[in-house]
């Protein structure tokens, strides 16, 4: 007998959340004291100001000469403005290098191609001698679906077409995103499959927003708990989709959990914290990929909140998450 999804969310509301990791609990309290939750439309300007203030500079990206960086403006989707890419090349590269195509987070409403999470991509790139290309897509609610994912697709197509000229290996492009960026990376994997576009080598989905219906047990359990709680998640989806949210009229390229077919996708790395609203969406998406005969590696970090490693990078669990991502990337790119 099936369980009504709304009932599962209600059950979650009545359940206590899992405990936070001891190294994360104190920092989270300080974060939430400064960063009001849940997200509301009135808070979007504040989130954008914070993101702008935290943008990485060229000097921070170069890391003392480890990378060279440039901004590139490339054609956008048909009839839409051009798309800006930040290109980060390892200066010591001697041949075509693999490249991570980064779609930033920000709940669909904030963030940029130079947001602080780009530092995590550069950490992994520095360890593995990779390039990173980060795309600046249009933001909701001013630019609702499909603008964000189409911008990202336009950037991906340019990257694949010009990879050899840029010193990149077009056969080893990995899609990577955090939170809203995880939704876009997963949506891109579906979109490029269905359009017979560039074929990525993998998709690295960190704490991804996958389902606009927000009807899981964890969505209720963490409705007002932690960073990017269930109420914030609904607000982000509402900004992207408007009145279409939680209706049948939602594209899988916007909300990948809506995909009827997840076969034939690039290998996936999917992760979530045990104390975040998006946890059960990550579990369900990995399970569907396995059921379709696909390849997915799933991690649920015990006691962790949304994007914990960006905020508390020196915690033991944060270092474990970093090592897991690096190990997965190494395996995928060595094939």
What are these model-predicted stretches?
Residues 96-106:
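Short beta-strand element of the alpha/beta-hydrolase
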Residues 161-175, 195:
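Gly/Ser-rich "nucleophile elbow"/oxyanion-hole loop immediately N-terminal to the catalytic nucleophile
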Residues 114-133:
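Short amphipathic alpha-helix adjacent to the substrate-entry channel of hydrolases
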Residues 1-87, 334-335:
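A glycine/proline-hinged amphipathic helix-loop "lid/cap" segment
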Residues 313-335:
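Catalytic active-site module of serine/aspartate enzymes centered on a nucleophile-bearing elbow/loop
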Residues 143-165, 325:
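Alpha/beta-hydrolase active-site loop
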Residues 190-248:
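Hydrolase active-site cap/lid region
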Residues 270-272:
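Short beta-strand/loop motif that positions the catalytic acidic residue
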């Amino acid at each position: 007998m099936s369980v009504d999804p709304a009932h599962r969310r209600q059950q979650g509301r009545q359940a206590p959340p899992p405990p936070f990791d001891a190294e994360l609990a104190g920092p989270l309290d300080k974060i939430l004291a400064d960063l009001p939750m849940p997200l509301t439309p009135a808070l979007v300007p504040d989130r954008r100001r914070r993101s702008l203030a935290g943008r990485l500079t060229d000097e921070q990206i170069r890391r003392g000469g480890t990378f060279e960086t440039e901004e590139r403006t490339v054609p956008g989707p048909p009839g839409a403005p051009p798309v800006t890419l930040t290109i980060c090349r390892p200066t010591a590269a001697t041949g075509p290098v693999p490249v991570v195509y980064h779609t930033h987070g920000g709940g669909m409403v904030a963030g940029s191609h130079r947001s602080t999470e780009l530092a995590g991509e550069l950490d992994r790139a520095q360890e593995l001698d990779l390039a990173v290309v980060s795309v600046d897509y249009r933001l909701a609610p001013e630019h609702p679906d499909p603008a964000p994912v189409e911008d990202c697709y336009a950037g991906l197509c340019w990257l694949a077409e010009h990879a050899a000229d840029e010193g990149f290996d077009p056969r080893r492009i990995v899609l990577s995103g955090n939170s809203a960026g995880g939704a876009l990376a997963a949506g891109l994997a579906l979109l490029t499959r269905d359009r017979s576009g560039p074929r990525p080598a993998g998709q690295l989905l960190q704490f991804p927003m996958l389902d606009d219906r927000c009807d899981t047990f964890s969505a209720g359990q963490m409705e007002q708990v932690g960073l990017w709680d269930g109420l914030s998640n609904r607000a982000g989806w509402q900004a992207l989709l408007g009145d279409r949210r939680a209706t049948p009229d939602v594209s899988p390229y916007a909300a990948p959990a809506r995909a009827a077919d997840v076969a034939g996708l690039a290998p996936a790395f999917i992760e979530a914290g045990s104390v975040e609203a998006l946890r059960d969406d990550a579990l369900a998406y990995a399970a569907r990929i396995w059921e379709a005969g696909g390849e997915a590696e799933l991690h649920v970090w015990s006691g962790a909140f949304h994007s914990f490693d960006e905020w508390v990078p020196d915690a033991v669990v944060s270092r474990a998450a970093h090592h897991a991502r690096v190990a997965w990337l190494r395996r995928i790119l060595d094939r």
